[in-house]
């Protein structure tokens, strides 16, 4: 077998012809990495306790422990945690309605210190108690990134939230009517109080904590220990003045004078006037002053008045403070200063342009005196009404920003903070320091002064992703915090009452927090399981909603918009339509998270305009520093950029630049879109809105009975099918040993088995399992016995996959033409043949549940003995009263018989007599059996019976357990058979030709052992042979031991399985027995079903037309589906037309290959044709020479139905390539027979009803069409009588409540307009809420009369009651 090919076992069966022009430097990464890695890091289950990193569960424990008692003499210390094995596997949890979880046990030490000898510095240990304590159950992730909670599969969606750190922004001039920009800053911790700084329109700077009342920022600066002098020194530069007897002198600083207007004549040292009064001072003037050696300039007295002092002014003799820092100079103050003999004074230098006096003004408005007063002011703001004692004040201030218990910036926050305030290090303390607050205020003042830039909060460098692990850790922490409080209270008692750790710790808070999160959080969602794509997309979703995120109502347009940093990180296309648009996004194909939780995307390094194979992952912040070329930039064969100007991105803008400036290049053209969008062929030719619909609707495609690969794909089909986990892939390579519809057994290659492991892999396939959306999950083997498979090869197909590729719909022969108005407004016309061939038939599985409860009147019973039912109605039930598997059932049929005791009723004499005669007890119970719903027909495919512990099982339950055990035993026997065969093969090789010291069948000493002898001895007696060579004897012994060990472990596994199955089931309170019945319902295509292509071209089936009436081609081929051509131009999704053309070529080439096979052409001819197709028609070339003749024949057989093409997104087939494919598919004679035109894109069609040709050629071809999960069967609904609302007595609404059709206000107007008064009266009374009237109508219809007596509608009585409740009495007069 030619194994040296680059193709896997399944790829060899059918190679997709790709039109991609770019070489693939980096394959698509595993698509569920984000979910799985995050949770692995959270649990660190397989890491030895000593080597665990402080993250996830470990971090949660480390943050809560050690707990010290109030008196300090008892301490609870955490050592390590470990996790138990889960009691049930995923399959069992789904069946039993349990959560797939593992128990966490923490090893804790309680240390009690000796009171007498311990001091606060050195404590003496009195005793240590160590114990493992149960700490709740943590849900485990399944192999495919989901969780099983209470039996249903759920996904925890990742959250995109604002990164912790510091942000500077302005209000864009919206707050104040003048349009002035008000700047603000906000320090956001991971947990703890937010600290905001903001300017008001008067340019005073305020701060607020947790959005409370605002206070001048200088209060905070005083509270962190700065006095007014220090505050001013931090924010201003000073002007130095010397006081003279009259006037003063100012120190000359050239930069501060330049550009100002002189308020007096400026003179130099010699007294010469350099600048006259009211003239502007220029650089020439300042140079002249410098040249003359002037260091001080004479200024008049009034130049000083109004200046602000920078320092306190103290009388040197008396020590009295004459003026305080930040006081304004006045004439009287100047006089005082002169009197005190003070010569030198320092004033703040401010100007209007770039040195505002903001902090000085703020300080002036602040009335607090010192540090304590400032802290008291903050205390009053945080705790209004509480008396501020000094201890309480200091404690509160420290807890706000300085305590690690209440404030945590997190590593990310510290890194972002340091980067923003311009520090070089990314490390630092997780609480705020005084420098931090000061730096933020400085930057904010600089911004107001016009220096620096504000942050863009929608930039992905300022938004980070919180994954499952992190969200779960936060919940576990909150549970531990509650435990910590409780333990702290009780630790004091531990030393007196000799308590152990488990007496103090109650794990309920942890369990409650986790249960609430996994069961009811906004981010824990019921998994969308319609098809493999919907699963994978759900797990890759990133939501801005959820706790700690945005809300739909408050989110504006900016947050929802596509941002330049989304490139390669978040898909710009795939997002829901409606209120959540832009808030829920999908991860791009290659995106991943870095250690801080920011999204990164890969780029290829470019050095000297040559592209290297080095790949770097860049976050949004790093990306801004580089010039990055697009993936489609032209390269020569050595990887050098060849264009003179290359289109590139630089700091968020698209530019054309020279190749030398390029530093990185995109990895692949598909890099910018998500999985769903990358599955849309010719996406680049579709309008963005339609592409969005196309990507979203693929997730709603229902798996059909026989999936068919898309003729036109994009090359992502295989990856998405494999990563979704729908298909079965081989864990290890080997040979297929056994195969049937339920299981595949593979004998693993020797090279891939580790010593002590069993060399057998058994894959149990899923058969007819119900998905969350009631679609059918079903796996089919695609390997044969004896096939050689490699690790990772697909060995079984699942729902919506075809030979390991995603296949969501069917390829349909489409004609774009109108047809009698049946395709008006996007309606779809379909041929009857499509329905007859079951092309769109899907299987839906419904789960029906019945519970037998314990009631006040006695317990309910599941039984076949049901009152008032004929034998015929009970025909499908077995002796236990449960329906047989395989029974076909219709609406109203009994599935599970159940009777409920009813209260004693007074009996008539006749009944008493009958009872006395027959001892009849049947009348005490009423029939509450489980019946099939209205409108449901199906086949029973599975029944499960759950019985509470201590209640005897019925025969059916016992039989189900026996079948399950039989299946399990079969698996074990298979494994054992292969292991034994392998062992005996090894023994035969070991012993053949060796000398023996004796053995069974009187083997003489010194006789050589040959194969004939071995064949004559029973294999199990080979172990009794005694080889002469000790080494061989030892090897024989070790094989024997390992076989025995394997047998023993299998027996243990079987015993464990039996114990699991035979123990009682956990059922809800009061439930004794529960039966689940699964019905498979076949849904054929019918008018009213919604269908769609992959380009947002959706419609509803309007009519199913007989084959003979459909338009047909010259050779008699009828079309499958007729679409309206008007649906294309206005919607601008031209991709669908290109898909149709390429699909048409795919089918034609397939038919040509089929003809070659049919004519039994030489294999060389087939190879030649395939070579022309794959290697001589553009796109990627394939190495077909490595395939054997048998493989080529098998591949050709698979291709005969149609050749699958791949046109990758943004790198797809060109128009010329499509035309070339058309000509390869339809040579002249075939084209003529089909009535095609010269370009092969259109054909002359004939009307099926008349046989006449249509007057114009019609575009025909193959399109991949999906049937969506909006089926008319689920929506159609009719009611005659049914339930009514309790208060208004009007019929309920909606199918689920079996409600009526609402006859609304506007419909009433319509009847009024026609004067149909009696119809209207009926609608408002007897058909709605006239209780007596509707009963009478029912009676009269039964009697065959047709009179109607309308009475008082109940809603009128409700209105009267409501008016009375307002205190207005209304009485109705009767006439």
Curated annotation (Swiss-Prot):
Catalytic activity: RNA(n) + a ribonucleoside 5'-triphosphate = RNA(n+1) + diphosphate
Residues of the signal peptide: none
Keyword Transcription (UniProt): yes
Known role: DNA-dependent RNA polymerase catalyzes the transcription of DNA into RNA using the four ribonucleoside triphosphates as substrates.
PANTHER family: DNA-DIRECTED RNA POLYMERASE I SUBUNIT 2
HAMAP family on file: RNApol_bact_RpoB
Name of the protein: DNA-directed RNA polymerase subunit beta
Originating organism: Methylibium petroleiphilum (strain ATCC BAA-1232 / LMG 22953 / PM1)
Lineage: Bacteria, Pseudomonadati, Pseudomonadota, Betaproteobacteria, Burkholderiales
């Amino acid at each position: 077998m030619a194994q040296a090919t680059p193709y896997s076992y399944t790829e060899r069966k059918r190679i997709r012809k790709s039109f991609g022009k770019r070489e693939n430097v980096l394959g698509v990464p595993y698509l569920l990495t984000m979910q799985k890695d995050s949770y692995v890091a959270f649990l660190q289950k397989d890491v030895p306790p000593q080597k665990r990193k402080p993250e996830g569960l470990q971090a949660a424990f480390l943050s809560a422990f050690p707990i010290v008692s109030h008196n300090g003499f008892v301490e609870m210390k955490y050592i390590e945690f470990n996790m138990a094995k889960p009691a049930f596997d995923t399959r069992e949890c789904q069946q039993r309605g349990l959560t797939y979880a593992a128990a966490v046990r923490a090893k804790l030490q309680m240390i009690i210190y000796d009171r007498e000898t311990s001091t606060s510095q050195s404590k003496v240990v009195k005793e240590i108690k160590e114990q493992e304590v149960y700490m709740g159950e943590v849900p485990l992730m399944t192999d495919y990134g989901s969780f099983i909670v209470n039996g249903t599969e759920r996904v925890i969606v990742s959250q995109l939230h604002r990164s912790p750190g510091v942000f500077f922004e302005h209000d864009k001039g919206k707050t104040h009517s003048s349009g002035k920009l008000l700047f603000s800053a906000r320090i956001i911790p991971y947990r703890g109080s937010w600290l905001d700084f903001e300017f008001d329109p008067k340019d005073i700077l305020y701060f607020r904590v947790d959005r409370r009342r605002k206070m001048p920022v200088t209060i905070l600066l005083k509270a962190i220990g700065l006095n007014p002098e220090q505050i001013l020194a931090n924010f201003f530069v000073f002007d130095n003045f010397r006081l003279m007897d009259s006037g003063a002198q100012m120190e000359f600083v050239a930069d501060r004078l330049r550009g100002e207007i002189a308020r007096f004549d400026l003179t130099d040292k010699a007294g010469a006037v350099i600048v006259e009064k009211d003239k502007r001072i220029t650089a020439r003037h300042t140079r002249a002053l410098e040249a003359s050696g002037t260091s001080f300039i004479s200024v008049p007295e009034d130049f000083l008045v109004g200046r602000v002092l920078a320092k306190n002014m103290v009388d040197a003799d008396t020590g009295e403070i004459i003026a305080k820092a930040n006081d304004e100079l006045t004439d009287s103050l100047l006089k005082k200063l002169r009197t005190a003999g003070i010569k030198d004074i320092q004033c703040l230098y401010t100007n209007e342009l770039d040195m505002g006096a903001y902090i000085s003004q703020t300080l002036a408005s602040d009335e607090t005196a010192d540090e304590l007063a400032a802290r008291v002011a903050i205390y009053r703001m945080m705790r209004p009404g509480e008396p501020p004692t000094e201890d309480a004040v200091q404690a509160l201030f420290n807890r706000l920003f300085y305590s690690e218990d209440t404030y945590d910036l997190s590593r990310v926050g510290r890194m972002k903070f340091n980067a923003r305030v311009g520090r070089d290090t990314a490390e630092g303390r997780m609480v705020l320091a005084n420098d931090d607050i000061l730096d933020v205020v400085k930057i904010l003042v600089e911004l107001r002064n016009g220096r620096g830039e504000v942050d863009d909060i929608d930039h992905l460098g300022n938004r980070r992703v919180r994954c499952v692990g992190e969200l779960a850790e936060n919940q576990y922490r909150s549970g531990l915090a509650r435990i910590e409080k409780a333990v702290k209270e009780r630790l004091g008692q531990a030393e007196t009452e000799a308590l152990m750790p488990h007496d103090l710790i109650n794990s309920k808070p942890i369990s409650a927090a986790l249960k609430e999160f996994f069961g009811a959080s906004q981010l824990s969602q019921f998994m969308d399981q319609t098809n493999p794509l919907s699963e994978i997309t759900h797990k890759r979703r990133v939501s801005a909603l959820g706790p700690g995120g945005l809300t739909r109502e408050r989110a504006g347009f900016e947050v929802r918009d596509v941002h330049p940093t989304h490139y390669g990180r978040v898909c710009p296309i795939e997002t829901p339509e409606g209120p959540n648009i832009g808030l829920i996004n999908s991860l791009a194909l290659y995106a991943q998270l870095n250690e801080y939780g920011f999204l990164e995307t890969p780029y290829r390094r470019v050095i000297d305009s040559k592209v290297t194979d080095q790949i770097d992952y860049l976050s949004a912040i790093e990306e801004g520093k580089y010039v990055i070329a697009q993936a489609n930039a032209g390269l020569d064969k050595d990887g050098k950029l060849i264009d003179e100007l290359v289109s590139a991105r630089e700091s968020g803008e698209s530019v054309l630049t020279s190749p030398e400036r390029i530093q990185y290049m995109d990895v692949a053209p598909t890099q910018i879109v998500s999985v769903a969008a990358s599955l849309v062929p010719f996406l680049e030719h579709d309008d963005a809105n339609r592409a969005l619909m196309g990507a979203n609707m693929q997730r709603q495609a229902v798996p059909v009975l026989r999936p068919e690969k898309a003729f036109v794909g994009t090359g992502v089909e295989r990856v998405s099918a494999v990563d979704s986990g729908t298909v079965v892939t081989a864990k290890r390579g080997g040979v297929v040993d056994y195969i049937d519809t339920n299981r595949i057994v593979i004998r693993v290659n020797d090279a891939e088995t580790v010593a002590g492991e069993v060399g057998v892999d058994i894959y149990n396939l899923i058969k007819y399992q119900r998905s969350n959306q009631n679609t059918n999950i079903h796996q089919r083997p695609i390997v044969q016995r004896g096939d050689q498979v490699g690790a990772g090869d697909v060995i079984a197909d699942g729902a919506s996959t075809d030979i390991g590729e995603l296949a969501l719909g069917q390829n349909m022969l489409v004609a774009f033409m109108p047809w009698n108005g049946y395709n008006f407004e996007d309606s779809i016309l379909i041929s009857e043949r499509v329905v007859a061939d079951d092309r769109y038939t899907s299987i839906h599985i419904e789960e029906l549940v019945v519970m037998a409860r314990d009631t006040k009147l006695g317990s309910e019973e599941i039984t076949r003995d049901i009152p008032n039912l004929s034998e015929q109605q009970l025909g499908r039930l077995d002796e236990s009263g449960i329906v047989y598997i395989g029974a076909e059932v219709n609406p109203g049929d009994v599935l599970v018989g159940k009777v409920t005791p009813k209260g004693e009723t007074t009996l008539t004499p006749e009944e008493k007599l009958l009872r006395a005669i027959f001892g009849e007890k049947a009348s005490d119970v009423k029939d509450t059996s489980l019946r099939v719903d209205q409108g449901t027909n199906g086949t029973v495919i599975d029944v499960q019976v759950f019985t509470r512990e201590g209640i005897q099982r019925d025969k059916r339950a016992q039989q189900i357990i026996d079948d399950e055990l039989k299946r399990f035993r079969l698996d074990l026997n298979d494994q054992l058979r292969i292991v034994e065969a392998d062992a005996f093969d090894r023994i035969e090789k070991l012993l053949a030709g060796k000398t023996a010291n004796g053995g069974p069948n009187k083997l003489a000493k010194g006789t050589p052992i040959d194969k004939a002898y071995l064949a004559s001895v029973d294999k199990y007696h080979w172990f009794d042979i005694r080889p002469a060579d000790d080494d061989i004897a030892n090897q024989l012994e070790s094989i024997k031991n390992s076989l025995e060990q394997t047998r023993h472990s299998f027996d243990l596994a079987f015993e464990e399985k039996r114990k699991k199955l035979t123990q009682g089931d956990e059922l809800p309170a009061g439930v004794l027995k529960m039966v689940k019945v699964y019905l498979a319902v076949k849904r054929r295509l019918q008018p009213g079903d919604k269908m769609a292509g992959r380009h947002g071209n959706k419609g509803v089936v309007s009519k199913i037309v007989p084959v003979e009436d459909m338009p047909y081609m010259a050779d008699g081929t009828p079309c499958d589906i007729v679409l309206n051509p008007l649906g294309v131009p206005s919607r601008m999704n031209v991709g669908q037309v290109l898909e149709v053309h390429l699909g048409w070529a795919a089918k034609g080439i397939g038919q040509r290959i089929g003809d070659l096979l049919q004519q039994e052409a030489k294999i060389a001819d087939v190879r030649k044709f395939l070579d022309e197709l794959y290697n001589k028609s553009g796109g990627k070339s394939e190495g077909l020479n490595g395939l054997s003749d048998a493989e080529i024949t098998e591949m050709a057989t698979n291709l005969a139905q149609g050749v699958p093409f791949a046109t990758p997104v943004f790198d797809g087939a060109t128009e010329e390539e499509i035309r070339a494919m058309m000509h390869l598919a339809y040579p002249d004679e075939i084209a003529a027979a089909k009535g095609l035109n010269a370009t092969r894109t259109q054909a002359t069609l004939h009307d099926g009803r008349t046989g006449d040709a249509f007057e114009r050629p019609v575009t025909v071809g193959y399109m991949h069409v999906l049937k969506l999960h909006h089926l008319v069967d689920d929506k159609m609904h009719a009611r005659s009588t049914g339930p009514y609302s309790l208060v208004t007595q009007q019929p309920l609404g909606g199918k689920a409540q079996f409600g009526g059709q609402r006859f609304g206000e506007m419909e009433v107007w319509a009847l009024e307009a026609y004067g149909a008064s009696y119809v209207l009266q009926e609608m408002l009374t007897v058909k709605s809420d006239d209780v007596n009237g509707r009963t009478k109508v029912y009676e009269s219809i039964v009697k065959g009369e047709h009179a109607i007596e309308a009475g008082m509608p109940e809603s009128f009585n409700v209105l009267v009651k409501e008016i009375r409740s307002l205190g207005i009495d209304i009485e109705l007069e009767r006439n």
